[in-house]
């Protein structure tokens, strides 16, 4: 595709908008290289991937790109066996996490709705769960290594903590001893060593090593001799800590090196997916649709809108090139929307052929073209001193040299900028030449000669942009099949030009021309009325379809509920009948045995007893089938912590909140939290002893399974909040008193969301950011009630 047309049609602006929806700079690079594809097959394939991403993101929410970065530099370093920074390793882990999650994200359990293209792409993803877990365990922030990274690091940091506590106690004691010699009763740190701020005139009173002096010279920062050994020990521990961290980073970097080929493939696939889902997000923002792709050179774009014009201001138009037509000639006033129409046709074709959905209505058809040529606007070169006409003609010469039956050509004001007679003749000749080649052409013009040409010649159709004579404003509506009419007399009259001047002007025009213009005006009015009726009919049809879909949905839902109820009832009945049948078989077996033995009086008596037993059992079975299901006693007062029964789900629930003014409460049903009205709840028959035993057993089970921390890194705010909320419930039920939520440092968005949730969580007593060694700002430590 020629670059000039892409530039003139402003495809670069579309790509700039598309980049806003990517997560990585690698995906932005893919967008920068985006061009129309070279075959209709490729176009359909890439449109299908966009449509699948569009559908899956609506059904399942945003794709799992959270925490994904461009790691090309980290991959390059790993290939050269360099040690990676913690931030780089963390991003590698995030990429591996995204790989793992994406495979599940695109997998559909619904056989009727498969995401074949996306599933094919994600088949190449190879999650490295072990490496992901190893990095996540060791690195808890872009600059912080976890105490859990190794036993050695844990022991070093524990010793550091002990030594730091000792030196702080010692230095506080020295502050009290030397308080009269200090500028302030505080300690400070210079070169990672604890020192005291001693007045310069009292330096002899505090024996020790001078490390620094204040800017004013009034204070010396002295390390007392009694702190030297402790400071040395702390310094030594910090060096050991650094050495151990370097070893851990080198070890993890080595693991990345061992798997670098797999990681590189995963990264390439994820960046491609980032690009694909950016196309889907942009389509959602535009309200775009998946077009049908034809290869016959004809198209029908329904309610086409220019994607770069404000949606509140843009005018929709039906733009089509029907079967048997190769060229459309559009006439109408300046600023009437002719140029926008040309750009809309060209840009929507470029977008579709680049795998992007288009701003139009469902059912729209786009044709695949090998080339789209556009001579729009005045791109003359001042340096070349080209006139408007020369500039356009230079461009037209290039188009004539290259265009064929697989090309779409867009001409704006064909033949303008020179003598009208010669310009019109040239325009007709150019159109005729391209018509003979079967090149598809849309051209705008002011020349009446081109209107006449379109009326006389096969395969060429007239069109016009509508003009409202009452308001003297263009409506920007395109009328295909109707040539444009000159409105000079009507406009002049409404602006106040005397009638006698207008009449004199009319006399200068042939009667045939006037009749032709009147015919055009009549056609325009009829076309406008027909389109208005069509719009109303379409609106009524859409409303009817929506109502039909609404009630069909309700009917389907009712049918599902009914079938489920019948299925449950049948299942229960079968169980009861099965029990009765087993009992009956046993009795009949006994009867046959008795008959074989003969009929003594004792035997006959036993036989009658067994027959009566069978009869009673069957009567009980029938009674059980007809007996309504017991749902328990209704409740009137409900409090937080009550355990009740929810009949509609046939499960016990725990009440989490007191009733609001409508009687609604939040309850926990298994892993679900739902809101119900107290009238839907029933008392349980469970005794207090059973309840205590069950709770004790449940707590025992939970204590075995609930960890003391939860890792939320790589999740978005919504997923992280839900996961943390559920985790806190489980931790509380397990009897844990303190837990750690790992959210990472990053931009702070995740930490803020978690803090907002913790403020109002019923199980939270207090919370704080982690201390050094716990994870710092990358974790939040929560104390539970």
UniProtKB/Swiss-Prot annotation:
Sequence positions that bind ATP: 332-339
GO MF annotation, one: ATP-dependent DNA damage sensor activity
GO terms (BP aspect): mismatch repair; negative regulation of DNA recombination; rescue of stalled ribosome
Signal sequence region: none
Domain Smr: 710-785
E.C. numbers: 3.1.-.-, 3.6.4.-
UniProt xrefs under InterPro entries: DNA_mismatch_repair_MutS_C, DNA_mismatch_repair_MutS_core, DNA_mismatch_repair_MutS_sf, MSSS, MutS, MutS2, P-loop_NTPase, Smr_dom
Keyword hit for RNA-binding: yes
SUPFAM superfamilies, sorted: DNA repair protein MutS, domain III, P-loop containing nucleoside triphosphate hydrolases, SMR domain-like
UniProt keyword annotations, A-Z: ATP-binding, DNA-binding, Endonuclease, Hydrolase, Nuclease, Nucleotide-binding, RNA-binding, rRNA-binding
Top-level EC class as recorded in UniProt: hydrolase
PROSITE patterns: DNA_MISMATCH_REPAIR_2, SMR
Family that this chain belongs to: Belongs to the DNA mismatch repair MutS family. MutS2 subfamily.
HAMAP family cross-referenced by the UniProt entry: MutS2
Subunit structure: Homodimer. Binds to stalled ribosomes, contacting rRNA.
Protein task: Endonuclease that is involved in the suppression of homologous recombination and thus may have a key role in the control of bacterial genetic diversity. Acts as a ribosome collision sensor, splitting the ribosome into its 2 subunits. Detects stalled/collided 70S ribosomes which it binds and splits by an ATP-hydrolysis driven conformational change. Acts upstream of the ribosome quality control system (RQC), a ribosome-associated complex that mediates the extraction of incompletely synthesized nascent chains from stalled ribosomes and their subsequent degradation. Probably generates substrates for RQC.
Protein name according to UniProt: Endonuclease MutS2
Organism of derivation: Clostridium novyi (strain NT)
């Amino acid at each position: 595709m020629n670059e000039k047309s892409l530039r003139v049609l402003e495809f670069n602006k579309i790509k700039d908008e598309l980049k806003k929806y990517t997560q990585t700079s690698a995906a932005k690079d893919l967008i920068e290289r985006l061009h129309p594809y070279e075959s209709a097959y490729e176009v359909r394939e890439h449109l299908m991937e966009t449509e699948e991403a569009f559908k899956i993101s609506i059904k399942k929410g945003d794709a799992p790109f959270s925490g994904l970065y461009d790691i090309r530099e980290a991959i390059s370093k790993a290939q050269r066996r360099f040690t990676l920074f913690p931030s780089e390793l963390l991003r590698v882990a995030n990429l591996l996490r995204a790989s793992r999650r994406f495979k599940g994200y695109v997998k559909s359990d619904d056989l009727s709705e498969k995401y074949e293209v996306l599933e094919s792409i994600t088949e190449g993803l190879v999650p490295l769960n072990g490496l992901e877990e190893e990095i996540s365990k060791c690195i808890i922030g872009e600059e912080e290594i976890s105490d859990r990274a190794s036993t050695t690091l844990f022991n070093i940091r524990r010793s550091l903590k002990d030594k730091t506590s000792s030196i702080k106690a010692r230095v506080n004691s020295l502050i009290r001893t030397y308080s009269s010699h200090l500028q302030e009763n505080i300690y400070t740190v210079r070169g990672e060593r604890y020192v005291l701020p001693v007045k310069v005139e009292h330096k002899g009173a505090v024996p020790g090593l001078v490390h620094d002096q204040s800017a004013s010279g009034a204070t010396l920062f002295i390390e007392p001799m009694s702190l030297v050994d402790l400071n040395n020990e702390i310094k030594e521990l910090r060096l050991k800590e650094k050495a151990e961290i370097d070893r851990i980073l080198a070890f993890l970097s080595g693991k990345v090196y061992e798997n670098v080929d797999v990681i590189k493939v995963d990264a390439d696939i994820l960046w491609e997916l980032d690009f694909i889902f950016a196309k889907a997000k942009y389509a959602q923002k535009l309200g775009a649709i998946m077009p049908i792709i034809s290869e016959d050179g004809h198209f029908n774009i329904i309610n086409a809108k220019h994607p770069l014009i404000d949606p509140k201001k843009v005018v929709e138009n039906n733009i089509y090139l029907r079967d048997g037509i190769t060229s459309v000639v559009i006439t109408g006033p300046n600023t009437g929307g002719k140029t926008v129409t040309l750009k809309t046709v060209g840009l929507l074709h470029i977008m579709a052929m680049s795998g992007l959905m288009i701003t139009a209505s469902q059912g729209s058809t786009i044709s695949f073209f090998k080339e789209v040529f556009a001579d729009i606007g005045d791109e003359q070169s001042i340096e070349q001193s080209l006139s408007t006409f020369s500039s356009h003609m230079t461009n037209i010469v290039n188009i004539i040299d290259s265009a064929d039956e697989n090309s779409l050509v867009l001409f704006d004001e064909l033949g303008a900028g020179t003598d009208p007679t010669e310009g019109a003749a040239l325009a007709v000749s150019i159109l005729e030449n391209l018509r003979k080649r079967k090149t598809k052409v849309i051209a705008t013009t002011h020349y009446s000669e081109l209107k006449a040409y379109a009326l006389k010649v096969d395969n060429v159709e007239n069109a016009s942009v509508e003009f409202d004579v009452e308001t003297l404003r263009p409506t920007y509506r395109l009328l295909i099949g109707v040539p444009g009419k000159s409105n000079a007399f009507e406009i002049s009259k409404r602006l106040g030009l005397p009638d006698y001047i207008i009449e004199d002007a009319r006399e200068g025009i042939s009667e045939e021309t006037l009749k032709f213009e009147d015919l055009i005006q009549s056609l325009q009015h009829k076309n406008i009325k027909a389109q208005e009726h069509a719009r109303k009919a379409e609106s009524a049809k859409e409303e009817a379809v929506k109502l039909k879909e609404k009630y069909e949905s309700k009917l389907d839902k009712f049918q599902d509920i009914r079938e489920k109820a019948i299925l449950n009832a049948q299942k229960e009945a079968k169980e009861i009948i099965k029990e009765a049948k087993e009992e009956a078989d046993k009795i009949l077996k006994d009867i046959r045995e008795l008959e074989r033995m003969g009929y003594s009086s004792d035997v006959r008596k036993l036989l009658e007893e067994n027959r009566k037993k069978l009869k009673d059992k069957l009567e009980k079975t029938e009674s059980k089938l007809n007996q309504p299901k017991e749902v328990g006693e209704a409740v009137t007062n409900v409090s937080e912590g009550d355990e009740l029964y929810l009949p509609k789900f046939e499960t016990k629930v725990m009440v989490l909140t007191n009733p609001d003014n409508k009687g609604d409460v939040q309850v926990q049903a298994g892993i679900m939290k739902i809101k119900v009205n107290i009238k839907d709840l029933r008392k349980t028959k469970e005794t207090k002893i059973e309840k205590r035993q069950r709770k004790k057993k449940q707590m025992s089970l939970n204590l075995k399974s609930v960890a003391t921390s939860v890792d939320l890194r790589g999740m978005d705010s919504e997923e992280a909040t839900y996961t943390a909320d559920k985790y806190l419930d489980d931790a509380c039920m397990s009897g844990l008193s303190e837990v750690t939520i790992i959210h990472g440092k990053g931009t702070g968005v995740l930490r803020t969301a978690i803090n907002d949730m913790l403020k109002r969580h019923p199980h939270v007593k207090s919370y704080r950011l982690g201390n050094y060694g716990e994870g710092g700002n990358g974790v939040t430590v929560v104390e539970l009630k």
